[in-house]
């Protein structure tokens, strides 16, 4: 269990970044965190990782208030990992396999176990075809997959993804969505922070919407996005499938593929 209860956070310069924020990562298998720039998404990620301590309120981990000592933070980070928007922030080696194996080797895990786990996660993210390729020759999307593999190899329960589809072409976005859904089916709890509203709508089963460091609204994905007034308050736009439903009278579809399957049947 990982959640926050009424946390607020103020930076040293006096800027109030979060105010009375409560979120529960057990609300869904893939949870979306949305809001305009400066709404507090990145700050909240740092709270969930124990990097920043709330000014007030509590972060709960495995049913207990998080203690900010070395032992407690080590236990937290064995269960919670993050993949940053820019994969170059997380890739340190020129060789893909060595980079993914880096954390495991630092922990002193046997080389046999390291090789097995690295192979498994590279298969999970579809990176085996370029596992021996120098990192500098990888595409941006391939680097993103390597960064995810580096987080997955630690076998954490929760995965925090910061803008996972940013900078990707349509094929890269499709591959990333498939990876995220595959991980959720394998039992990972995933929190996605993104400006890609269509991604959040299609892939998430629960959403938290932030505005100026507070939770403006939360709920099941369709429920949140159908409330246009909240979307506008947050400085966001509705997903295109929601717009089709509300403005053109189409049935409410969750997936793009479902919409095109429906229209194909109608045309035929």
UniProtKB/Swiss-Prot annotation:
Domain ABC transporter, chain residue ranges per copy: 2-237
Record key words, sorted: ATP-binding, Cell membrane, Membrane, Nucleotide-binding, Translocase, Transport
Superkingdom, natural source: Bacteria
A GO CC term attached to the entry: ATP-binding cassette (ABC) transporter complex
Entry annotated with the keyword Membrane: yes
InterPro entries: AAA+_ATPase, ABC_transporter-like_ATP-bd, ABC_transporter-like_CS, ABC_transpr_CbiO/EcfA_su, Co_trans_ATP-bd, ECF_ABC_transporter_ATP-bd, P-loop_NTPase
Bilayer topology: Peripheral membrane protein
Assigned EC number: 7.-.-.-
Top-rank EC class of the record's enzyme: translocase
One of the Pfam families matching this protein, by short name: ABC_tran
The keyword Transcription regulation is annotated on this UniProt entry: no
MF GO annotations: ATP binding; ATP hydrolysis activity; ATPase-coupled transmembrane transporter activity
Subcellular location: Cell membrane
Entry binding sites for ATP: 35-42
GO biological process, one term: cobalt ion transport
SMART domains named among the record's database cross-references: AAA
Function: Probably part of an ABC transporter complex. Responsible for energy coupling to the transport system.
Family: Belongs to the ABC transporter superfamily.
Record-given protein name: Putative ABC transporter ATP-binding protein lin1170
Organism per entry: Listeria innocua serovar 6a (strain ATCC BAA-680 / CLIP 11262)
């Amino acid at each position: 269990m990982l959640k926050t209860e009424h946390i607020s956070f103020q930076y040293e310069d006096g800027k109030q970044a979060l105010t009375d924020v409560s979120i529960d990562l057990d609300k869904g298998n893939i949870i979306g965190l949305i809001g305009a720039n400066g709404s507090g998404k990145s700050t909240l990620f740092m709270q969930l990782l124990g990097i920043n301590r709330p000014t007030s309120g509590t972060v709960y981990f495995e049913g207990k208030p998080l203690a900010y000592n070395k032992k407690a933070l080590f236990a937290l980070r064995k269960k919670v990992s993050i993949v940053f928007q820019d994969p170059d922030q997380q890739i340190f080696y020129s060789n893909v396999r060595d980079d993914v194996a880096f954390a495991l080797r630092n922990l002193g895990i046997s080389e046999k176990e390291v090789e097995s786990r690295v192979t498994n996660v590279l298969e999970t993210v579809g990176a085996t075809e370029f596992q021996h390729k120098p990192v500098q020759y990888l595409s941006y999307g391939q680097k993103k997959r390597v960064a995810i593999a580096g987080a997955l190899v630690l076998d954490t329960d929760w995965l925090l993804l910061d803008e996972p589809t940013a900078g990707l072409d349509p094929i890269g976005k499709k591959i990333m969505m498939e990876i995220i859904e595959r991980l959720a089916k394998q039992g990972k709890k995933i929190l996605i922070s993104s400006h890609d509203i269509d991604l959040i709508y299609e892939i998430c089963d629960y959403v938290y919407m932030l505005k100026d460091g507070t939770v403006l609204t939360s709920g099941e994905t369709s429920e949140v996005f159908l409330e246009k007034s909240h979307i506008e308050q947050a400085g966001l736009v509705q997903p295109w499938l929601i717009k089709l439903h509300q403005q053109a009278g189409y049935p409410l579809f969750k997936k793009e593929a479902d919409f095109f399957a429906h229209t194909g049947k109608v045309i035929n």
